[in-house]
């Protein structure tokens, strides 16, 4: 990886691989469904539990029907539809249908509270909602037209089947032309500052991301890949990295609406899943949960798993590889503000070869990356940790109706500031150290929670862990470990403290241990540190 010294002495890093072309004229649905004619009988989505399936023929037909119906109901270019659904077989059709009508897809978490969904609906200026009977109660009072999936007809709502049939009867309308520069998605992200914001993504953004991430897919893989659809489809990785990427490759998505280890393993075996994007807590489950031993793992056709969202502890990776020797583990890195995946392991030059263990991979084609000193903004050379910044055609247009936060995140040169600390080594592999906002400042030293968590997970009695900062009068902040201990373990707080102390520099020592029943995590697998910290502080006050 050659660093490019610019006139202003910036260290800018680019991909080892040549640039890939990005088509100019296509919308995202057109791009994703290119070449679909040969695959109309192939299953595009199947639900792991119910077996309900849709073919590529269904996807093409119903995407058109939905787009026509939404247009006839008054949806216009740039207007938002909020989708409140679990991972169902129709999800891809719904997203593509909204986009084909010129609308903007905004997925919401179906497990969210009514108040949280209301915030997203209001913040996005949504014109309608698509949901199912289970979630209808959450959205019926929001004052918008509601389309409900399923056979059941609900008074006051539009039935999905009826809507599609109405779409059949609609003639072709003179829609305003949809351009690549038009918005097509408005996912909500906490960004680098913690509060939920709408991320404005265009057709061009998402097509550019798919071109970069899929550059290594060989022609013989088209129509062959079976992907597990467990990561929520309302999440950027779910809709782009799973749904759109798999449809582009004419593979099959096995949709799971919730995580259950037995259902998960059954789905992998029964549907011959070859690629499973998952989160680190599931890796932990696969390594440590005795339920796994109930299954004949020799029946697995799984070739690779990809983890993102949180760093994978090196010892956990080793344990997983020992248990699943034929499954390749790829760690990836992405963010909503960059349209999904940004760095990844797959290497077309080496077949399924990957980057170094515990790196998040290499720079994808068409991307530029630099690392800056968070205090001075100065760009840094190889092997020097700094804030990861990325520049490409995948960078969002900004946060919806929030110029102040946009300006904090994207600078005048078009660099997206990720809020993550990392470095690039001599071979072009990138390593993420931690998030700026999660670094613990102990007596002026920066301590990365992820590093301490990785060490603690090597302890045989530790089943899960999270390290959080606690305020301290003398040190500023101290690292405190919230530990899920094996019920049969005899270790006390002091044993855990000594275990870490034997493995780190003095300033990185864990200063307090709290035994907890579980570690709260978001649906995407990220540790909810603030929740843990607040809980400890409230206990300490009593």
UniProtKB/Swiss-Prot annotation:
Top-level EC class as recorded in UniProt: ligase
| Biological source species | Arabidopsis thaliana (Mouse-ear cress)
- Residues annotated as binding CoA: 258, 443-444
Ligand binding (ATP): 189-193, 197, 331-332, 336, 420, 435, 526
UniProt keywords (A-Z) are: ATP-binding, Endoplasmic reticulum, Ligase, Magnesium, Nucleotide-binding
Question: Positions of the region SBD2?
Answer: 332-399
> Under what name is this protein listed?
4-coumarate--CoA ligase-like 1
Question: Which cofactors, by name?
Answer: Mg(2+)
